[in-house]
Amino acid sequence: MAVDIEEFRKEVYNVVASIPSGRVLSYGQIAWLVGCPRHARLVGKVLHGVSKAEYLPCHRVVNGNGRTAPCWEEQRGLLEAEGITFRANGCVDMRKWQWKLEG
């Protein structure tokens, strides 16, 4: 399936902007929510291109195991400031902190 990258970017931004403080989603969950469940890596690429001028709470996006981005040391501190705790292995407990969408 061909992806309209600009439309995909807008939809990813909308989902990420909606993640409430103290909750997280994975790249794969975001891809699924925007209707492209096989494009988790593209979600990551889109978020990597977000400028600081475009405030998006990208720190609330982790991988499917709850691991934070290896090249973004501040991410953990931002999540902790919102009350999110980490397991001994350094991952977010997705069962506890994942944003549960109603519906």
Predicted features along the sequence, with ranges:
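Nucleic acid-binding interface residues in structured DNA/RNA-binding domains
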Residues: 1-103
